[in-house]
């Protein structure tokens, strides 16, 4: 086999690979003879079909099957011999004739080689959130609202009321698609409608009609409506007032708590603290990763981005429960491209840093992180044992420990400032970020 490096520019490289004719023809001949012993053909007994007949009828097909098997073997050896770190490959067949060498080009995308410097340029705003009894009481109040019962009342609409409405949305005086609905239930203050919509209903009474003006958010998913000033003609058809359950032993049992109200309140606070810790870690880590992407200079392999896009599509399908009749491949790649590119770039940068630094995950550190994570489950010890039996899960935990160490290492060199934030705003932002990332 002869290998010629045709061009190598950046992360792109082409290998012209030539396989001797006798090597190809020998394998093809053996496959034809093997096929002749098993194939059925009119006029011949099984195993007695002449090889020449098989070659005449199936020779081209057999040759292509042989080549399809042989090409990956040849380019894999060439890549190994040339010591190339390949991210993606496309094969272009050049010459394929009996009695002549097989020639093909392997167009490669290589993993970029780069060094990350300038960590002091990274700016991180570290969120500081104080979790007090006020936030705990508000969380319990939110839980009470989840179990609220509603009864119809004859009064003006107030916050937390459930209203049944008809509405027609208009832009520039014309009704827009998706802006009209009848008999829609809205809980005032829940944030299920765009900002300003629910506030505009407060004070209305049953049977009343009103036109309100609201502006769609700049980041609204429908670009035709993003940032647009619109009007909504609203008719209130029913008003229901919420009746919240008392926080007593019966109520806390709904959440699997057996120790009464005091235990319930303590568990709520512990859960809030645990969730807050991981969210704040994520917020800081996201800023660190963003900063790393800004200072690192390299070309991102498109094949890795495409692979990540395909994985995101499959993940979306899983989230939809494998919806029948829904082909995720029909979704445009650009819907997933930005997130996919970020993930690939972050992964490449972290790998580059880890190759130059020695970050290790000690067994005790992995165990400590596992203990912390399983506290969010109903049966922590049982969950812990299940995870420890799963090699993939344990490998992910080990990787997370190393990732946390790397993040701390970068933070020691970065410009870090603090910013006080509200607990519920942090939770809301986290939910929005998760939704935006599918």
From Swiss-Prot:
* Keyword Cytoplasm annotated: yes
Which reaction is recorded as catalysed by this protein? [protein]-peptidylproline (omega=180) = [protein]-peptidylproline (omega=0)
Keyword Cytoplasm applies: yes
Coiled coil spans: none
Question: What's a GO biological-process term for it?
Answer: 'de novo' cotranslational protein folding
Keywords attached to this Swiss-Prot or TrEMBL record, sorted alphabetically, are: Cell cycle, Cell division, Chaperone, Cytoplasm, Isomerase, Rotamase
Q: Which InterPro entries match?
A: PPIase_dom_sf, PPIase_FKBP_dom, Trig_fac, Trigger_fac_C, Trigger_fac_C_sf, Trigger_fac_ribosome-bd_bac, Trigger_fac_ribosome-bd_sf, Trigger_fact/SurA_dom_sf
Q: Where in the cell is it found?
A: Cytoplasm
GO CC annotation: cytoplasm
Report a single Gene Ontology molecular function.
peptidyl-prolyl cis-trans isomerase activity
Could you name the domain of life of the organism this protein comes from?
Answer: Bacteria
Root EC class: isomerase
All copies of domain PPIase FKBP-type, residue ranges:
160-245
Q: Outline what the protein does.
A: Involved in protein export. Acts as a chaperone by maintaining the newly synthesized protein in an open conformation. Functions as a peptidyl-prolyl cis-trans isomerase.
Which NCBIfam families has this protein been placed in?
tig
Record-stated family: Belongs to the FKBP-type PPIase family. Tig subfamily.
Q: What is known of its domains?
A: Consists of 3 domains; the N-terminus binds the ribosome, the middle domain has PPIase activity, while the C-terminus has intrinsic chaperone activity on its own.
Protein name per UniProt: Trigger factor
Q: Which organism is it from?
A: Francisella tularensis subsp. novicida (strain U112)
């Amino acid at each position: 086999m002869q290998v010629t490096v045709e061009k190598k520019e950046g992360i792109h490289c082409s290998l012209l690979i030539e396989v001797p004719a006798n090597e190809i023809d020998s394998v093809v001949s053996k496959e034809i003879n093997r096929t002749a012993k098993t194939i059925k053909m009119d006029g011949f007994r099984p195993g007695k079909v002449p090889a020449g007949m098989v070659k005449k009828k199936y020779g081209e097909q057999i040759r292509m099957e042989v080549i399809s098997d042989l090409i990956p073997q040849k380019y894999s050896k060439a890549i190994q011999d040339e010591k190339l770190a390949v991210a993606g490959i496309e094969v272009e067949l050049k010459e394929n004739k009996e009695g002549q060498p097989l020639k093909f080009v392997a167009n490669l995308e290589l993993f970029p080689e780069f060094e990350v410097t300038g960590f002091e340029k990274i700016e991180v705003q570290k969120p500081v959130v104080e979790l007090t009894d006020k936030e705990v009481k508000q969380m319990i109040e939110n839980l009470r609202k989840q179990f609220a019962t509603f009864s119809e009342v004859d009064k003006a609409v107030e916050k937390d009321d459930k209203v049944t409405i008809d509405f027609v949305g208009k832009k520039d005086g014309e009704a827009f698609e998706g802006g009209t609905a009848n008999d829609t239930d809205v809980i005032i203050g829940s944030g299920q409608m765009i900002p300003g919509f629910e506030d505009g209903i407060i004070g209305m009474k049953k049977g009343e009609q009103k036109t309100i003006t609201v502006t769609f958010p700049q980041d609204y998913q429908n670009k035709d409506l993003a940032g647009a000033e619109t009007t909504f003609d609203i008719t209130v058809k029913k008003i229901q007032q919420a009746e919240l359950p008392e926080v007593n032993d019966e109520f806390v049992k709904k959440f699997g708590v057996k120790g009464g109200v005091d235990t319930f309140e303590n568990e709520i606070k512990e859960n809030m603290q645990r969730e807050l810790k991981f969210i704040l870690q994520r917020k800081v880590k996201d800023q660190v990763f963003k900063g790393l992407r800004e200072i690192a200079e390299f070309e991102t392999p498109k094949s890795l981005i495409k692979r990540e896009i395909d994985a995101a599509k499959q993940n979306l399908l899983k989230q939809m429960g494998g919806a029948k009749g829904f082909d995720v491949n029909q979704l445009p790649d650009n819907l997933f491209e930005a997130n996919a590119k970020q993930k690939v770039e972050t992964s490449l940068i972290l790998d580059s840093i880890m190759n130059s630094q020695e970050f290790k995950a000690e067994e005790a550190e992995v165990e400590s992180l596992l203990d912390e994570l399983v506290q969010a489950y109903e049966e922590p010890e049982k969950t812990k044992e299940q995870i420890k039996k799963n090699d993939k899960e344990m490998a992910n935990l080990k990787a997370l420990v190393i990732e946390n160490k790397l993040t701390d290492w970068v933070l020691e060199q970065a410009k870090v400032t603090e910013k006080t934030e509200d607990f519920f705003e942090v939770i809301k932002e986290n939910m929005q970020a998760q939704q935006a990332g599918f």
